[in-house]
């Protein structure tokens, strides 16, 4: 599939703009200025449209290629501000720290937590161990999951110490000061950020970190 058909700009310009935004803490205006210094005049609103178009595509391609996971999961949520109000980004990683999935919700309750865990089980199968914080909503959700999917009663572990890994894994989200103006904008952008970060972590664990290029990774994904 040609993802760059009918585009005014060369695909290399688009992949650089999208890759820089999703990997680094740059604004759309920053990227517009970087491209201008290299002789390419792109308005910051165009960079925004590219990110909104390609970020969810990259995320779906990445998900199709990563369907395996270690059977110990860590699940947590972090806060995202959208139009001045807090929303909640549920995130999950496996025992090796690889990203499993994300889900942005307006509410932090047992229904949201249950739906997210159910979605993970549908993707990766039943886990042997699920580590979470001690939030009451998560405990209720896990009790429902254990009953619905007939998991071992002791598969749920609520440990602050053991859950530190995923709390540290939130840093690439928290370091950004992005002000999202809609839930859809936030969803699309965060999907792209998580996709590139997941690829970065995979390269880091395979000792290839010094050769990591978000633009190169995007080019490979969109060429497949």
Curated annotation (Swiss-Prot):
GO terms for MF: DNA binding
GO biological process: DNA integration; DNA recombination; transposition
Alphabetical UniProt keywords: DNA recombination, DNA-binding, Transposable element, Transposition
DNA-binding listed as a keyword: yes
Keyword DNA-binding: yes
Pfam families: DDE_Tnp_IS240
Signal peptide: none
Residues in Integrase catalytic domain copies: 73-222
Residue ranges of the annotated DNA-binding region, renumbered to this chain: 33-52
Purpose: Involved in the transposition of the insertion sequence.
Annotated protein name in UniProt: Transposase for insertion sequence-like element IS431mec
Species annotation: Staphylococcus aureus (strain Mu50 / ATCC 700699)
Gene that produces this protein: tnp1
